[in-house]
Amino acid sequence: MASIPSFPLWPRPVRRLFGPLETSARGMGIQQRFLDTIATNIANAQTTRTPEGGAYHRQVALAGADPATGETMTVVDPTPGRMVYDPGHPDANADGFVEYPNVDVSVETVDLMMARRVHEANVSVFQAAKSMLRRAIDL
């Protein structure tokens, strides 16, 4: 994910004016990464075979240690998937069990709602900062 450019060459007072815009834009970028990861998890909640082999494993998006950079990373949840006895399934092992993903759709839905609300809050902050800048320019 590309990081949001900062304004290092601009004079300090100008950078301060754009600070709220930059901060909320970074927040929106981080939340978008969370939303994308959650959507991928939900879409693969029943995927028993991946190109790498085995069932899909839930991914978790994490914000970097310094949220000001807007950097995120995605890690794989190592929790094993649930085993279901289904000897007729093409992905069943020798004992007739199929490993299903470790994705709980209800947990993903709650995470999705939370990420969406935080994203909306960042959009509101961005709009408010933009409105204040326009008023300042009109003065």
Predicted regions, residues:
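Amphipathic alpha-helical polymerization modules
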Residues: 1-139
